[in-house]
Regions:
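Sensory/regulatory domains in signal-transduction proteins
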Residues: 1-115
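PAS-family sensory modules
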Residues: 1-6, 96-152
Length: 152
């Protein structure tokens, strides 16, 4: 599943798999904010990490719960990278999403539930909680997420 966005997160490309899983047509998503598929149970903390990494020109991995047009959902393991022009300027973002490791979803659901509760006291509380979660695992955010994907 693939999509591309501009610098502001508006969809400029979505492949057929993206459209099929999300239940939209190209006309319904083109030039719309990518958060058209964001499920309300996704913590803002995860997207803060995502945007912070990408603005620094770094790739990021994330488990994302997406919402379909008919209000169902599906989980993906996303890899998001900045798109760079010939002058090394970030001109947009490219996301490739794969099937997530099913055994990781329960861990992620629990973490995301905790993050959502923490965010009720402010986004900084969610960020602090995620930093501590990574620290306790002795991994960077990307290492943690990737290790969950690789776990048996």
């Amino acid at each position: 599943m693939t999509s591309k966005t501009d610098l502001k997160g508006k969809i400029v490309y979505a492949n057929d798999d993206f459209l099929k899983y999300a239940g939209y047509t190209m006309g319904e998503v083109l030039n719309k904010p990518h958060n058209i598929v964001r499920h309300e149970e996704m913590p803002k903390t995860v997207f803060k990490y995502l945007w912070d990494y990408m603005k620094e020109g770094k790739e990021i991995f994330a488990y994302v719960k997406n919402k379909t047009k008919d209000n169902n959902y599906y989980w993906v393991f996303a890899n998001v990278t900045p798109s760079i022009d010939v002058n090394n300027n970030i001109i947009g973002y490219y996301s490739v999403r794969r099937m997530p490791n099913k055994s990781a979803i329960s861990t992620i659901e629990s973490l995301y539930s905790d993050l959502l509760r923490a965010e009720q006291q402010g986004l900084n509380k969610g960020v602090e909680m995620l930093k501590n979660f990574c620290k306790d695992a002795d991994k960077t955010y990307n290492e943690l997420i990737f290790s969950l994907q690789e776990a048996k």
